[in-house]
Amino acid sequence: MVMASLATRAQTTNMGHHDMVHLTTNLLYDAALVPNVGVEYAFAPRWSAKAHGMYAWWSDDSRHRYWRVAGGSVELRRWLGSKVNAFLLKGHHVGVYAGAYKYDFELGGTGNMADFNYSVGVSYGYSAPIGRRLSLDMGLSVGYIGGEYTKYDHEDGCYVWLADMRRNYVGVTRAEVSLVWHIELGRKGGR
């Protein structure tokens, strides 16, 4: 019932615009060779929800180099300002997010591996249009990262456990410079 009410409110306050879905990729992750994709949807005026995932499982066993990470996050955003059109997702936004991921990083020395780490926090960002269907979303998040990880070395063809560690980090948790593609739903002809 609540979701139906939100959907009806979103349709009636959309001022003639069709529903939009927004596909994103964080260019900072792309630069670090971590493919990623996100989907954001404005479910009510000034409110949107975003889901984001990343996956990179690169390895070179002959040199003992690993660059592996998999994970995702969800975020609830509130769009600010008097002239904001949240269905097009432009302007300033604040939000709350939660995420989980696993990783294995070794670049020829001591490696770090985690099966499950998590993060929670708050975000601030700004989204600026760079074309009719594209925008650039820049943001920063602060919060908490927690979980356990293992430090290891590679010696004589074997992986040697060094220590189990606990991560309790408070500070900057994410940076975002995302390319956003706005896709209008329910309309033929692309106009």
Task: Annotate each PLM feature.
Residues 87, 111-152, 159-160:
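Beta-strand-rich cores of mature extracytoplasmic or soluble domains
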Residues 1-13, 179, 183:
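Bacterial Sec-dependent N-terminal signal peptides
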Residues 73-79, 169-191:
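Outer-membrane beta-barrel "beta-signal"
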Residues 19-21, 31-33, 66-72, 114-120, ...:
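Residues that define the transmembrane beta-barrel architecture of outer-membrane proteins
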Residues 29, 41, 78-80, 126-128, ...:
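Residue-level signature of outer-membrane beta-barrel architecture
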Residues 11-19, 46, 81-91, 130-136, ...:
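Short loop/turn motifs that connect adjacent beta-strands in outer-membrane beta-barrel proteins
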Residues 22-104:
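Glycine- and aromatic-enriched membrane insertion/assembly motifs of diderm outer-membrane
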Residues 54-69, 100-118, 147-168:
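Flexible, solvent-exposed loop segments that connect beta-strands
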